[in-house]
């Protein structure tokens, strides 16, 4: 499953080709993703301009000019395949974070949602296992959305510190590695980076969370960041 750094790379690639541009057309080829694609998906996004492509934890967050927000998750196997009029060569594709050049014929049967953006760019959401999702909300309800409201602090945020981490670990009875995977403790950390962070901080993955205080918490917060 893509973790926070990989999702951030995808976000940057999408921002490069989508921000400030109009959604000309959308093809929803399958509605039955992990959460069904809303029936009014096309109606709400077609003709709208993407103002900002953001991220919250492992979710991509697209903010549109009318206040609509697109929430997307890559699941286990999801990819955003970017096709611009001139990116089918290795040289031009290297300008987009993530190197999104591809042969579209290899992925067509798994491309469930396709965005046609102004200037001829096409973004294809490919997800063979269909554990990903795309759904809609709006600015007023974003923070309280069921997929967002439980999330802990961003590990790259200035408010994520050792004392904050230590406080959020209190009361956890699972080993520290499992606690780090709890998105309510810190958002976006997955299996790979939990292991790496614990190793960098010199902590056993079996340690009890309540013992991660003081300098231990400071080291772990720094490693997670």
Residues covered by each model-derived region:
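Basic, nucleic-acid-binding surfaces and adjacent catalytic neighborhoods in DNA/RNA-processing proteins
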Residues: 22-41, 54, 88, 164-225
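Phosphate/anion-contacting hairpin/loop surfaces
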Residues: 70-187, 193-194, 198-200
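Short clusters of hydrophobic/aromatic residues that line enzyme substrate/ligand-binding pockets
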Residues: 45, 148-151, 203, 212
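Generic detection of long, well-ordered alpha-helical segments
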Residues: 1-4, 105, 155, 159, ...
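A cross-family signal for N-terminal binding/gating loops and helix N-caps
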Residues: 1-126, 131
């Amino acid at each position: 499953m893509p973790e926070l750094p990989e999702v951030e790379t995808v976000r940057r690639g999408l921002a490069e080709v989508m921000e400030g541009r109009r959604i000309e057309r959308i093809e929803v080829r399958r509605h039955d993703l992990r959460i069904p694609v809303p029936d009014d998906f096309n109606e709400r996004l077609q003709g709208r301009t993407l103002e900002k492509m953001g991220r919250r934890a492992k979710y991509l967050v697209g903010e549109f000019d009318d206040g609509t927000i697109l929430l997307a998750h890559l699941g286990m196997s999801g990819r955003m395949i970017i096709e611009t009029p001139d990116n089918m060569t290795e040289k031009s594709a290297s300008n987009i974070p993530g190197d999104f050049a591809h042969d579209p014929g290899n992925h067509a049967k798994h491309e469930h949602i396709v965005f046609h953006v102004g200037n001829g760019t096409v973004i294809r959401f490919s997800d063979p296992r269909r554990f990903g999702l795309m759904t809609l909300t709006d600015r007023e309800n974003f923070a309280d959305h069921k997929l967002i409201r439980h999330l802990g602090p961003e590990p790259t945020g200035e408010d994520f510190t050792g004392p904050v981490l230590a406080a959020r670990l209190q009361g956890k009875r699972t080993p520290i590695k499992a606690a780090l995977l709890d998105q309510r403790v810190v958002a976006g950390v997955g299996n790979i980076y939990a292991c790496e962070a614990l190793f960098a901080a010199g902590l056993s993955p079996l340690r009890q969370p309540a013992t991660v205080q003081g300098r231990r918490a400071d080291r772990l917060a720094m490693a997670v960041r």
